[in-house]
Structure formats: C-alpha cells, structure tokens
Amino acid sequence: MLLADVVRTSNQVSVMSSRNAKVSLIADLLHRCALLVADGAVPAAEIGLATRYLAGSLRQRRTGIELSTLSRLPAPAVGGDVTLFDLDAVMQRASEMAGAGSSRARAELFLGLVRRLSAEERAFVLGLLRGGLRQGALESVVMTAVADAGGAPLDDVRRAVASQGDLPGVSQALLVDGPGVLVLFRLTVGRGVSPMLASSAKSLAEALAKTGPAAVEWKLDGIRAQIHKQGNDIRVL
C-alpha cells in the first residue's frame, strides 16, 4: 500500500470532529489494505504497518535518526510512489546501524527517502519520528476502526489487544483470518499486558463497593512495571 494513501486518510481524520467519521475513514483504509492482501498485491504485514502509522507510531522504538538532520531537508518531491514497506525498511536499517560513521550513514539513508516524499508525506513521516503526529486518531479510535473493518465485536478486539499489547498484530490477524482468530490471543508470560492502570470510579464509595475493604496511602513517585516469572526466567516490563 502506498504511504500516500495512509497520509491522505490521516489528513482527512485530522480535520474531522466526529469520532464516528474518523473511525469510518480509518476502517475504510484498513479494509482496502486487506483487499490488497487478499489479492496478493501486498504482504499481510502492511495491514499492521497501516494500523501502526495511523495510530501515530513507528515499528522501531529507536531509529537513531537525529532531529538535527530534519532541519536540512531538500525540497519536497511529487511523491506518491513510496510504500509502507519502503518507509519501514528505511527505519529498520537506520535502527540497526552502529559504529563509526553510523550517524552520517543514517542521515544519508533518511535523506534518500525524504527526496521521494511529497510535502504531505514528509510532514507525516516527521511527525512519526518526533512522536508528535497530530491527526486526532488516538489508539482507541484506531482500535474501533480495526473492529469495524474486521467485522468483530469491539470488546473482543480490546481483549486481544490487552492480552498481547499489540494492536497492529491483532489488526493484521483479524483482517487476514477473520474474527475467530481473536480467541488465540491470550495472556502470555513474558509479554506485557496493555492496561497498566486501574479503571476509574465516579466516587470513593463506588470504588470501595467494587474492591471491598482497602488500605489507602499517599501516592509516591516511582515507576509502573509488570514482573513476569516463568521458572528461573524473570522479566521486568
């Protein structure tokens, strides 16, 4: 799938105020991506990439591309020929570079991609890199769109994502294999669970009614972590 298709949908979503309209636009794009996969035109992994990019994140946690590189960009191109895989491949190669000269190599690699991007595509990619993509499509909106595109109950999608912490993976599986695949997503030792915050209550009385007797302490600064143990293997997530 072309990056331009995702960027166009993102830009349309960014000017929409209606949540339902945003969901509909994203679901339509994911459905079109699934049709391309079914026809053998693109690999199934592009569904996951489209989902991830519309939710505002890259697959690579760190690319190593320095922000200073982003201030020396060539003029925008006509664009329209860069695919989702093209973008992911550049980011993956950048993330794997190390050693002497790697910063310069990353910059050259990234600039090679940028020279092929239109102004709209460039703004989208820079937003992903900076982690500040403003398009009005929070993960909850994208998750609802995934459920709509895949014809699955939203609660089933939420449960699958919560157990695996992987919305793109759930999206790809659902749109390729159908709603029945969601039962395969279960809690797995060593894999982080998404919801790390307790659900809210309207009042203290309501909270205590749900939990029963409780001890309450002042909240201290610290970190929130999950500890997974399987035999002698212990992971802190």
What are these regions (language model features)?
Residues 1-237:
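N-terminal nucleic-acid-engaging modules of covalent nucleotidyltransferase systems
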